[in-house]
Amino acid sequence: MTASTSSSYIGRFAPTPSGYLHFGSLVAALASYLDARAVGGRWLLRMEDLDPPREEPGAQAAILKALESYGFEWDGQMIRQSDRHDAYGEVLNRLFQQGLAYACTCSRKQLEPYHGIYPGLCRNLGHAQDDAAIRLRVPELEYRFVDRVQGEYRQHLGREVGDFVIRRRDGLYAYQLAVVLDDAWQGITDIVRGADLLDSTPRQLYLQELLGLSQPRYLHVPLITQPDGHKLGKSYRSPPLTEDQAPPLLLRALRALGQKPPADLDGASVAQIMAWGMAHWDAALIPRTLSVPEAQLS
């Protein structure tokens, strides 16, 4: 499946301010940016600040500064999910009133034996919304989609996920609900992101279907992993992006995405590297794997 034409493509990058951008973030951002710009599409920026307790002070400003110093130019104003709570609440209440969602008072300890697959303990108990998580009822159906890099992906929502949380017990809205509503609101046609979100996609497809929303195309790029197999990330103290390393790290990110920048780009400026990337971007060259060890990258 190919990306949209230039007249209709709208992509996005949606970082979480729980820490600074690192090399793994750069790979995902670069893939989404080049996939949009290569066809003359728009590229939007969204700050996924749904979880204030986990937000690192100064992270939002640092993320914007890093993107700018690495040559990313977004269209329009950045939006913040923290400004969208009314929209999330309106849809959540509608789902609850229609019987498509319900309140759940299960504790983490109660759910430990079920290994992340919710068994429906509160499904028919009729709890009030107060001091409870809100879960979306899922059908006993298998959802499938064809990812532009990873190929066909299938997941049975009932057996492999169970009814999933759309608002946490502490009142914070869950990622699955927010991302679906924001992508639709912004008119996103193409989602390019890390392969760690591949298994979230069927839940999002179900929500889109339930709410009558259009479904974007998806492209999940391989995660960059450390020697122990963990992905690069804030949880593992991956070093933040620094401005002085922008040109070599952009070239390294291009190679991680299977692109083939020529040797004469060594020593080039950020603008020159980005221009080459936009002119030569080929999503078909992205490795069709879930991860790429950082140690393999030159």
From Swiss-Prot:
One of its GO terms (cellular component) is cytosol. Gene3D superfamilies: HUPs. ATP binds at K234. It comes from the Bacteria. Its EC number is 6.1.1.-. Binds 1 zinc ion per subunit. Keywords: Aminoacyl-tRNA synthetase, ATP-binding, Ligase, Metal-binding, Nucleotide-binding, Zinc. NCBIfam families: PRK05710.1-3 (NF004314), queuosine_YadB (TIGR03838). This is Glutamyl-Q tRNA(Asp) synthetase. It comes from Pseudomonas fluorescens (strain ATCC BAA-477 / NRRL B-23932 / Pf-5). The gene is gluQ.
